[in-house]
């Protein structure tokens, strides 16, 4: 522990920087133009799962000192203005999604809360201040049970279906 806190990595570490008491803005291997393999994976898997080959996705993967779970800060841009209440309701009604969204009461999903759980947890649901067509939300899920890209895609699909007035089969 002292070695970790002193920011010394042993020769056996697979990480580029110490993880203990740290946040590292890198996950995966180096790819073109400064992207990591994990960031490209989020983009490619989201496109594949949604069946939208030209879906615009940009992700920055960050390693944080948690045992398990993936968390995402999602910035979803839509063609039309978003109704936050309708988006929240769509998420509440979605199978395998649990909404915990009372930040004023200290209620929002965290990795500690979701370990060992099957559902995807969503909170901090809000409209971007300067962009009425943009929804901001925080997503957590146990990645040993369900992958991050699938979670992101399913949530985006549900919100998109609600915004367009359609329904989702997910």
Regions found by a protein language model. Give the residues of each.
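Active-site-lining helix/loop region of Rossmann-like oxidoreductase modules
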Residues: 1-90
């Amino acid at each position: 522990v002292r070695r970790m806190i002193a920011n010394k990595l042993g020769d056996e570490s697979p990480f580029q920087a110490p993880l203990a008491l740290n946040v590292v803005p890198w996950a995966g291997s180096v790819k073109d133009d400064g992207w990591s393999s994990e960031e490209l994976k989020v983009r490619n898997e989201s496109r594949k799962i949604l069946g939208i080959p030209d879906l615009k996705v940009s992700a920055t993967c960050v390693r944080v000192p948690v045992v398990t779970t993936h968390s995402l800060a999602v910035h979803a841009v839509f063609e039309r203005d978003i109704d936050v209440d309708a988006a929240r309701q769509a998420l509440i009604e979605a199978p395998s999604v649990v909404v915990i969204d009372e930040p004023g009461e200290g209620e929002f999903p965290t990795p500690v809360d979701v370990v060992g759980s099957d559902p995807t947890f969503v909170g901090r649901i809000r409209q971007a201040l300067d962009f009425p067509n943009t929804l901001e939300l925080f997503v957590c899920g146990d990645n040993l049970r369900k992958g991050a890209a699938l979670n992101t895609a399913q949530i985006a699909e549900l919100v998109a279906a609600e915004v367009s007035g359609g329904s989702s089969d997910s």
